[in-house]
Structure formats: C-alpha cells, structure tokens
Amino acid sequence: MSNDTSKQSVLFDDLADKVVVARFDQPQASSDGGAVLLKGCDQALGLTAAMAACLEEWRQQAKVRHDLDELLRQRVFAIACGYADANDAARLAHDPIQKLLVGRDAVNGAALASQPTLSRFENAVDSRTLYRMGAALADSVIARHRRRLKGKAKRITIDLDPTDDPTHGAQQLSFFNGHYGNWCYLPVAGFVTFNDEPEQYLVAYVLRPGNAPATLGAIGILKRLMQRLRAAFPRAQLRVRLDGGFACPELFDFLDAQRVKYVIAMGRNNTLKQHAEPLMEVAREMTARSGQTEHVYGECAYSARSWSRERRVVIKAEVVRLHGRLPKENPRFVVTNHTGSPEQVYTKLYCARGEIENRIKELHHGLEIDRTSCTRFQANQLRVLLTAAAYALMQELRLRAGDTCCARSQVSTLRDRLLKLGVWIETSVRRVVLHLPMGTPFADEWRRIARSIGAVPA
C-alpha cells in the first residue's frame, strides 16, 4: 500500500470557508466497519464452518498461504458486503475489517488472497463437494430455526422457483432459453417458511443448464428438504407451493406418496377452459356492471391423460379491466389437495408465494447471484452457493433486527444501514477496538443486533 499522500489526496478550494483536503491515507481504517455483525451471525449459524468442512485440501501444504476455510470466508463476507466479483480481492487485500472477518489480525495480519488464488479455488471444487456444501447450507439454516422454534413449528411451507441467470460468454451448459429470450443458466431456488412468518429462508440454490425443464432436479431437492425438515420438526405439517412449470404427473405422484399438502399452478388447456366457462360468464357479467376487474372462484375435478388419478383443481375466473384497454379474460388454475374454499386456497395459500419473487430479486440485485462468469459449470455452482451463504447471513442479520426499523429491510438497505460504516481500528495485546462514527444514524439498531448475537456493554 502506497504511503505517498500526494498521490492519494485531492483538494477542494471552494467547498467551504477553508480549503478541504481529502486523503486516502489511513491503513487501519475501513468502510465496512459494521460487518462484524456478519461474523456474529455466522457463528450463530455455524454456516461457513459447515461449508468449509466439506472442502478437501489438494494443495502442497508447504506452499499454502491461505487455508481453504479462509478462502471460503473471504468470498462469502466480501459478497455480503457488496463485492460480488473475485476481481475485488485486489482492493480488499489489506482491508482490516475483511481480514478480521476471515480470522486474521486486523492490522498486522497478512494480506488476503488475490483474485488468481480465488479463481483457482473456485475451479478446484468437484461435484461431490458441491453436493455436500449444498447440504451444509440446508442443514445449517434448518438447525438454526429448529433451535429458535424449539422444534415446534406447526406448519412449514417449501417453495421452489426457477429464475434466469443470463450468460454473456462461453460458459459450460449455457443455452438459449426461448421463454426468457436469451442465453442463460436456469437455476432453481428453494425456500422454507415457518408457520405464517413473513420471511422465506433460502435453503437451496441449484444451477442448471439454460435449456433445463423446470422440473429438472425438483423431486430430488424436495426429497432432501423433506427428510431434513421432518427430522428437525417431526410434528410439523409440510406444504409445497410451486408454479406451473413444475406441474407434471411424476411430481404429483411423489407429493401424494409423501403425504404432504400442495398448491401447484397449472397451465390452461381446452378441458380446463371448459370447466372454467360458467365461472367466466359470471365474471363477464359482473365486470360489465361494475366496470372494474372482477374475479370468481370455483373448482372442478380433473385428470390429465398422463395422471394416475383425478385431482382437485381450483379455478380463478378473472376479467381484467385497465383504463383505456379492452377487457382481458384471465382464467387461472391451481392443483391442490387442500380442503379449504377455492377462494381461500388461491388467495391465502397460492398467492402468498409471490413473496418468493422478492427474495429472488434480493439475490439478483442485492448480492448479484447471477455473477456466473466462470467458464466451468461447477465453478459457477460454487459461486452461487457462496452467494447463497452470504444471503443466509443477511437473512440472519434481518432476523436479529426483528424489533428494530430494519426488520423488513431489503439486503441493500441492511448493508447501507448496518454494514457500511466508516471505522478506524486500534489493536493491543488483549483487544481490537473499532472506532465507529458517533453520528451513525442507526447506531441504536446496530447495538441492539450486536447484543442479540452475544456482544455485551463495554
């Protein structure tokens, strides 16, 4: 790091009554001072330790400067702090907070790993290790909530949702997807919701080829999650919510065999349209009288030719009216084994899965989980797992903020309010002191969260 302040300074001669000089000359300072909260959240979850335990060392020990667990933590904490690209490693190599998060001495510790070292790490992980790391993510999150709820959840909802991950190079298994209209991967994200809580917790994120059918891997993911959830919450009722891309006979038969409740959207066809027609006629009459969007709910028994048996289908017959446009008919169908009224099943159970879209937006826009620019498919799978781990830490941070104004904040807002704090670091033989700004706007919330993860007044 250069100590030549003449090259690190800028001067403003007309911003105030005095000349204003800005210097980047504080080696013991960082702009991520609040990120120590993430380390506390990680210790509560045991997440990076569990994922690092899945890694197998392949390097010559005499030449190792960065242990595998340090490399993993370096990437996870950097992603959570907003540094999604491995190229950011060069800027963060001497950052005292980033070193502290990894487990090194904040001031005197050796520099963190470089981008080439991190790239070699990403490309050295095999599919077996990736599978174990994905299981470690699910196990850590589920175990955390088993402790929180004392194993007494009444109902647990599993949501799977595919999303597109646009690719812009020659990545392995990148294909053109006609639905999304670009070259991409097609990952699937898995979330669990406990009882009627507002948060959906990420427990799985599996990268898939860009031309993968929506159902690819879905049964395997559900089976593994159900086994873990039943072991952790033996008395909980499991419920599965899926969009129409997952509606296939194999999945319905699997869910029936597992004896779980489900609500799964289904695409319209001529037979279902015929079942919906009486309801659509009522909706047309209602919207003609009111001039507003109207919908009517009903149900029918239906069995496609490929199905093993007849199932209940809830119908939403809707006519949409928008100003300046002709009315648009919009019948919707949901396959379910719930016994509630059609309106309740659709509006209370199925529509609630819309919150999953907000979680996926956080992953894309808050943590850039689609930063999958490695050539190897497995390296990109590792990247999304590390980003998923960073998101799990941010969700734990949000959970700890439950009694503050940050309780429902998006990831980017949490980062700005709680992590992006200027800090000057002082070390001694016995302690590390973080000098944070007295004028921090959310200092009370920060202290409250810190106490929830074990900090005590000093």
Tell what function each PLM region has.
Residues M1-A232, R398, G422-A458:
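Dynamic "connector" segments at or just before major functional cores
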Residues T5-F24, K261-H365, R448-A458:
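An anionic, glycine-rich sequence signature occurring as long contiguous blocks
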Residues C41, A89, E343-L382, L386, ...:
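Short amphipathic alpha-helical "interface-anchor" segments enriched in bulky aromatics
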Residues C41, Q74-R75, D88-A89, S114, ...:
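Short, conserved catalytic/metal-binding motifs centered on acidic residues
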Residues A90-L92, D105-V107, L238, A401-V411:
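Short, glycine/acidic-rich hinge or "gate" loops at secondary-structure transitions
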Residues T163-D165, R208-G210, N269, V320, ...:
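Short, glycine-/Ser/Thr-/acidic-enriched flexible segments
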Residues A212-T271:
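Domain-level cores of phosphate- or acyl-group-handling catalytic modules
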Residues I369-T440:
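Basic, amphipathic alpha-helical segments enriched in Lys/Arg and hydrophobic/aromatic residues
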